[in-house]
Structure formats: C-alpha cells, structure tokens
Design a protein with these regions (language model features):
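Donor nucleotide-sugar binding/catalytic pocket of nucleotide-sugar-dependent glycosyltransferases
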Residues: 23, 39-113, 117-122, 128
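Aromatic "clamp/platform" in nucleotide-sugar-dependent glycosyltransferases that forms part
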Residues: 207
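Short alpha-helical donor nucleotide-sugar binding micro-motif in glycosyltransferases
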Residues: 194-199
Length: 299
C-alpha cells in the first residue's frame, strides 16, 4: 500500500489492473461469499486465531489512504471483477473500466493434434482431458475435489486425464477408471500450445476466477473449455458455442459438460467460433486499442 501511494503522490495518471480482489479487501485475494468488504473488513472468518483477527481491519483501513487520489484508475479484466469494485466500500467511487487480458494469437493457434501428441509422448488414440492448476491438485481455488468427483462418475477405457501443474498426488487419482499423465510445470508458451492442441477438452473447475487466461489459451488452439458459470468465465465462454458453462459447484453438470465437449471435440463450427471469439476480443490489437482509448481520454 505504501508503494502504491508513493506512485500516486507523483500526481500522474496511475492504473491498477485488478488480477484478484486483494485491493478491495482486508487481505483476501478472493472473498467468495463474504461481503464484509462492502462496508468494513473486520473479524475475518478465514482467520482462526482470535488474537490476530484485527489484522484484516488494519489492512483495510490502511488501504483507505488510496481511495481519494483523483489520479487513480482501476481496470478490471471482467464484468464480475468490475462489479466487485462497484460494491466495495473503498473504491466504488473510483474511475474504472473493463479491459480483458490479452493473448498472443499467433503463438496460441491450432496445430495438428497427432503431431502434438507425438512430441509430448501422449497416447494417440485416447480422449484426453486436461486440468491445469498452479499448485497441481493442492490449490483450493482450483476446485480439484469437484473435478475429481465429476471424473469419478465417468467411465471409459478410451479416456485419460492430463494434469498440468507443480505436482500430482498419485493417491488422489488412483480410483479413476482411466489413465492419468502428469506434465509437471510448463512455463513456455510453445510447450503450452502443444499441450492444448494435444488434448480434446480443457476443464477448469476453478471456484475463484477474475478472468480465465488458460481458457482463452485453449480456445485459441481450438480446444473446447469447460468451466463453472462464475467469476470472469462467462465473459469468455458462450455456452455450447465457445465452450460449456456448468452450474456453479454442480458436479453432475460439470461431468455432462466434459462429455459434451468430448463429443464435440472435432466440431469445426465450434472451433471456428472459439478462434474467432479470441481474435475479436483478446488479441493484442483489440486489447491495446482499448488501453490507448482509455489513456487518450484522461491524459
């Protein structure tokens, strides 16, 4: 907060791009159902030790130092994030707008699926379901338990799950009736493009998502995404046209979405819809033009 204020004191137009809710709360990156940030973060329900529950109020009050700077502008990547700003006690009055994340649509693009699988040493004749999480299956925001239950309700000798992340716990997937492959952490865009092209469906069971960068990466490669209807995901997925939006935390609907995506994985019309959508909304050209329009309005 101190560093942000030191920049604001320069008096120049200052933009903060909100990747999560941290700026709006007493410390939470995602508030989920908690609405305390609407008025005052105090007695945080996520802090178990009574002796330190005051911390969130202290952090929240500390952020009040920022709210009256007229040169502060907030940019949200989705309508959901913008709505959170509008409801926040701290920054509801601050100038704000929605500009989505951008994507290198030249780098992330379709390539031959067989070639991609051969290069990654993945099976050629199996339906592959990709799940990605920054901390493998251990990140609570990524909803692995829900996806695990959805996959547990599926069966088929011709299916396999591919997990992208830091690690995969063998015990957590041992009950599945199909094979699994751990890709570990992949950070370069070339390898990610190969992986998206190698699979048949990309599933995000995320319970907190300000945007959904991996979703547009998959779409740009022609791979159908499946995700819950929450956060910034509805800004990206148009139900059954550019992916599948499952009802929030609905395991059965998530399973149905995966099966729908698998059955439409070679649908050229859907692939075209996805690629066109990414190009028209998230390409470098489109997004940078939005930033420049905003800059020209206030400079």
């Amino acid at each position: 907060v101190k560093e942000i204020e030191s920049i604001l004191k320069l008096g120049k137009p200052t933009f903060i791009f909100l990747h999560d809710m941290w700026l709006l709360t007493g410390g939470c990156h995602y508030a989920f159902s908690c609405q305390k940030y609407y008025s005052l973060c105090n007695e945080c329900p996520t802090i178990n030790r009574t002796s330190v529950k005051w911390i969130c109020k202290y952090v929240f009050k500390n952020k009040e130092r920022l709210k009256n700077y007229s040169n502060l502008h907030l940019i949200s990547p989705s309508h959901w994030m913008d709505d959170c700003v509008g409801k926040s006690a701290l920054f509801h009055h601050v100038d704000r707008m929605i500009i989505p994340n951008l994507l290198n649509t030249v780098r992330f693009s379709p390539i031959d699926k067989i070639v991609a699988r051969q290069l990654l040493q993945l099976p050629l004749n199996t339906q592959l379901i990709l799940f990605a999480a920054d901390s493998g299956t251990q990140n609570p925001y990524k909803g692995w338990p829900l996806l695990k239950k959805a996959l547990g309700r599926m069966s088929g000798s011709n299916m396999a799950i591919v997990v992208l992340g830091n690690f995969l716990c063998p015990d957590e997937i041992s009950s599945f009736p199909f094979a699994s492959y751990s890709m570990g952490k992949i950070s370069d865009e070339y390898s990610l493009t190969l992986l998206y092209n190698a699979v048949d469906v990309y599933v995000t069971s995320s319970l907190a998502e300000s945007f959904g960068q991996t979703i547009i990466e998959a779409q740009a490669c022609g791979t159908i995404p499946v995700g819950f209807d929450l956060g910034g995901i509805p800004d990206i997925i148009e139900h059954e046209k550019t992916g599948y939006l499952a009802r929030e935390k609905d395991i059965e609907d998530l399973k149905d979405g995966i099966l729908w995506a698998l059955s439409h994985s070679e649908d050229e019309a859907i692939k075209k819809n996805m690629i066109d959508s990414v190009s028209n909304k998230f390409s470098y050209k489109i997004v940078t033009e939005q930033h420049m329009r905003k800059w020209n309005m206030i400079k």
